[in-house]
């Protein structure tokens, strides 16, 4: 077998008949499969052992040779080679066809490659191939020209003969008529008898004339056809063709079927054709030029690749190895077989019949029919259903052809090459493990034993518990007591990977150190649930075991859960306390007035109360019951750092551990602060979720990950402990209905009645009534909500849960205890009848019914959203999978400008709300200079929070930062342009697959995005705004938006004219150029609100001034227009901004750089307008880097560079346009991609990730890139002594090449444990 690590590219091309014969080990001559009595393959059949190899290892068909010692011998009796049976997976056969057939991919695909090559319309091509028309393959012009006059004279003679014959016949008939009439007259017949005779005579003469004329016309047609006869001409009339063949057979050749196509291709001069097409393109116009361009693409492909177009017509058909189209016996003695065998059988049957007919010398019409059937059967084998009705099997099911095996989710690419199954894995239900540390998981004993079986067996032998591997295996299977001790030892510090489907981002797989637990459920740390999106309502997770030392090291260093606290999308911590933990910490840090033992100032009667010399003393008081955790106290602290402002007052040289200070706080807050790192300033406030998030963010920014991990673990423990102690529970009694509710409802009911009366009187129309009612009831709902909030006591558990940020919100509380309010109908409009009841009181039947609309739509939406969002992620991954950090710095000077703050009216700086996702974690492209010219931060510095604060303090509002949009790396991007990795908080590593991270970061929140298209605030007739997921798809697919808004092509003054339904906008340019007119703009779309020159805002009106690229109407701008008018940089900014708007509306934080990575891929290509002296074809798409390199080369040689314009491609198109044919074929439209790749003889350089996964190489990202792969690990003596590996008794296991990823894999299938006796 070929080792995948030793080749660098993979090429696909057209196979000629000779290639097919070279691959083959013999010809399949019979349609038989296996003998149903002996169950052995039939000789020369589809499973023949002589062709494909033996069915049993080292055993020939007749049984003469058995055993491995005869290896390589070919049996003289049955002709079978003695070898392994697995050669039946790789040996191919072939079928020699009695007549050539065309390959359906090249004839039927769109566009038809054969048609373009031969310049034949697909319809004509079909007629030729399926024997409905003859085609002229060659004409001997010279001979025809030389003998034309002779032939013409012969034709004239023939015509003369026909005319003479006609005249003679007419003469004779006329004389006979005269004689008959004379005779009748003599007999004295009546006049009507005479008339009848005359009429019949004249009729016969007319027929004679017509017959002669037809003959003359036919001769004319034959002659005209012959004189104009040219190659590739179709002749549908069989009689005409026969005549031509009989008369002028030596001057031309013609045929039908694939043979004629083959002859045409043989006579085809590719170079001459390419030259003439280039000439047409240079001089032609319109349709003619377009057609020539399309044809040139195909012709040039053959010219440049050196492929022979003969490969599109087959003389032999390959037969794939039998193990890939198996036949298996079912229980009932029946057989199940792959559809391919049926399809091959049809081909062989028809082929054999055709051979027989040709040998018998059957009439041409019968032979042609058989040839047509053969062509159809080969078509069905290659791509069933592409032409005509598909061939069906039992139960009218279309048979799966070779193309179907590659296509779609169940095809070879997606099912078997990109989604392989893994050994050393298990799955089970998950339960919570609150006692675990962040980097641990609980692994059921039985599962661990099965997973670590080889390790345990090896260790049992090492420790002399077992004599050999076989007995060790028996011990493990019988679960002897020693096994458990060995298992404990083996799993120590051996991380396992846990994965929960769907794995939407990279945190869906993390490494943990296993702890053995009883039971059969995997225990999961509560803080990693957020990353896995797991809950414990029956979710299952899979466990995988990293085997090699390198895999274990990667799992521990890169994938351990405590190293993955930050989200790769936004850089915010994901391992946050949630639900009960939040409630517990909130309870712990609450301050309650009047609680037991609270601080009281000294009076003349009593000293100070509630003052403690240390936290320990306060805890003693609490244990004694004299102090509540939530009471305000004064306490002297020495081990906790004071808040920053207090520290500046109290300690001039800064606080050191041991310095005492007094805090006015609660014991709970002191306990909370003891959980944080020593040097973290004291936090003296109530901890709701937002504050907790802020603290953990801060910790992640300032402390190493290990400290953060330990801290969140402590917070988790404290959270659970105090949540239990707080006794927060919810019962019916806690759901309190506010007493004002009745009065509020009655008041609004009266208003609604008034509106209803107006409507009845006709003072309001239907729409106005509905809008007024909706407004009234929205106010009522809001008022009930406010009343509810004021009515609830502070210690109510429901309010505590909501206010702490653990879960839920006030709207849900209002629904429970206030009123549900207005609901929508399936169209998304409000139903003007509100739901007045709360869930506590219960709904009436009508209320329940109208509530179900929204509820059911919600469920349906969720299901649709999940599928859509998954598909979006898949397309994003596909388009960005080859964006990998390839170098440290591309040294570009370019960058993009980002805003840090806006100046307010009073001159103060207002920090930009989106700094976190725009400037944060990037690298400065130029020095940041303040108003006086001082350099605040130098170029190349990373922008973290401290740096941004420094810039704002210096009054700098915008900075220029490096971005992937301006990166000049030839492949992938450079680390400096990408900036900081959001997941680690450090500069991104070389080898990081930032493209995939970007796709996951955008795709993972996709499910949260809403499906619906929003109505603009109740304005009827207002255009729908497309929002949510559809909008994101529209942007990434670069589609023209519905209701697109025109943008100003030039800067100038607006002239506005309106008619009944339309606006007409004319822009008079400032530079005095031609006026630009936008006609027929629908009034329904409404004009854009703009800021006028005097600073006021208003609708665009006559005389306003607009800049280039300003939108003129409401709606979304078309990105292609933005590209045309404003250029690539603006369209990049536009797309990033628009995508971010959708995500921000849902409260999802994603860093701009992820969206930029995708947008960069959408703008990578250039359309060639003029090819200059380059090889590019006009109208073709090419990579920008390739375009620039080629232009540089041509200019250096003194040629004319090509002209091109940037083009914006949607992600699906961009994925299919990738250089890698493997990646494109595994994405969509597999057959089309492969057809194209084969004609162009495409070579896949294996740069991206997908290509390498498909052929089984390590991916060129992460530790798979060459700079990491060629590291050699030299273990120390201790490591050598302590390490245990998969059973292997060779001491050279730790030879110097230990750790080389390119070493041969262990063939586990061939391991017989019996060798170790």
UniProtKB/Swiss-Prot annotation:
Query: Which biological process terms from the Gene Ontology are attached to this UniProt entry?
Result: DNA-templated transcription
Pfam families per the UniProt record, alphabetical:
RNA_pol_Rpb1_1, RNA_pol_Rpb1_2, RNA_pol_Rpb1_3, RNA_pol_Rpb1_4, RNA_pol_Rpb1_5
Q: What is its EC class? A: transferase
User: Sorted alphabetically, which SMART domains does this protein's record hold?
Assistant: RPOLA_N
Residues that coordinate or bind Zn(2+) 1: 60, 62, 75, 78
Q: Where Zn(2+) 2 is bound, by residue? A: 890, 967, 974, 977
Q: Name one GO molecular function term.
A: zinc ion binding
Provide the function of this protein: DNA-dependent RNA polymerase catalyzes the transcription of DNA into RNA using the four ribonucleoside triphosphates as substrates.
Q: Which HAMAP family match?
A: RNApol_bact_RpoC
Q: What is the official name of this protein in its record?
A: DNA-directed RNA polymerase subunit beta'
Gene name of the encoded protein:
rpoC
